[in-house]
Amino acid sequence: ATPKQAAFALALHGGAGAMPKGTYTPEQEAAFHAKLAEAAKVGYEMLQRGDSAVDVVQAVIAILEDSPLFNAGRGSVFTNNGKIKMDAAIMNGRTLDAGSISNVQRIKNPIKAARMVMDSSKYIMFSSAGAERFAEKYNLEMVDVSYFYTQHQYERWKGMKDSTEGGYIHYVDSVMALQKEPVALKNIEEKY
């Protein structure tokens, strides 16, 4: 018998790039894998229930943002000048609707703000203080910038800042969920 093909797929990763062997202890690597497994399980269960791919992406990214282990939300990398500023973007591949925020410092879950931009505004992007005012208007949770600080990221920033390399590499976290449904292709110019 031919195995039944799943009606959906879920892909996630906790950062791009290859970390040199020995960067993390086996316990730290286990913590990364456990959190990714938790996020994948939540996303898989949502897709099995029939939740939309966009809802799944938002929920899974929020799990990563809430964890100090990943470079999204809590645990974000520091900018070259020692600040924490975050971006997030989300898109519905079926409708081509998109929303994003950039350069924010107090929105607990930037992905929720990006989703709110997509669903509740005529714009595609808000940035900085404007993005934070938008998030407050829609009662998204705001936190003090210290919430995002982790000693690990501070030490990484300090090491890069003090090095002669002169740059700071930012690894991105991302999630993608696909639903196997017919998609009506639209002329992109009709959308924008």
Question: Where do the model's predicted regions map?
Answer:
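Alpha/propeptide regions of enzymes that mature by internal proteolysis
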Residues: 2-192
